Amino acid sequence: MPTINQLVRKGRTSETTKSKSPALQDCPQRRGVCTRVYTTTPKKPNSALRKVAKVRLTNGFEVISYIGGEGHNLQEHSVVLIRGGRVKDLPGVRYHMVRGSLDTQGVKDRKQARSKYGAKRAKAGK
């Protein structure tokens, strides 16, 4: 417990919260270029081949980003949009691709939760 005199001299410092997505630098999204597109395996107890990409952002950061949805058209030098949001079973993956913007196409034949995957509404006739 500090004395009154110590508080007068120093004061109390408020704890600053650390950002969970520092590469965005307080922006909602960031643009970047894919430097490598590959698959990786998740932590135990899960098993899959998760699609991820290493992305060089416009601010110079190089981050690993998850490509959500079934199938994608990304390759090296694709220009992509990154948002925050980690993938719990992939260590080091703290960002998501925004589907349906820039070079990233939306998920084909998606009927539900379309806005999350950049899918257009299906025609009424089909």
UniProtKB/Swiss-Prot annotation:
A single GO molecular function term of this UniProt record: rRNA binding
GO BP terms: translation
Residue positions, PTM 3-methylthioaspartic acid: 89
Comp. bias intervals (Basic residues): 113-126
Pfam short name (any one): Ribosom_S12_S23
GO CC, alphabetical: small ribosomal subunit
Region annotation Disordered: where it falls in the sequence: 1-27, 103-126
Keyword terms: Methylation, Ribonucleoprotein, Ribosomal protein, RNA-binding, rRNA-binding, tRNA-binding
Superkingdom of origin: Bacteria
InterPro entries, sorted: NA-bd_OB-fold, Ribosomal_uS12, Ribosomal_uS12_bac
Cross-referenced SUPFAM superfamilies: Nucleic acid-binding proteins
Record-stated family: Belongs to the universal ribosomal protein uS12 family.
General function of this protein: With S4 and S5 plays an important role in translational accuracy.
Oligomeric and partner information: Part of the 30S ribosomal subunit. Contacts proteins S8 and S17. May interact with IF1 in the 30S initiation complex.
UniProt-recorded name of the protein: Small ribosomal subunit protein uS12
Organism this protein belongs to: Paraburkholderia phymatum (strain DSM 17167 / CIP 108236 / LMG 21445 / STM815)
Lineage, broadest ranks: Bacteria, Pseudomonadati, Pseudomonadota, Betaproteobacteria, Burkholderiales
Gene: rpsL
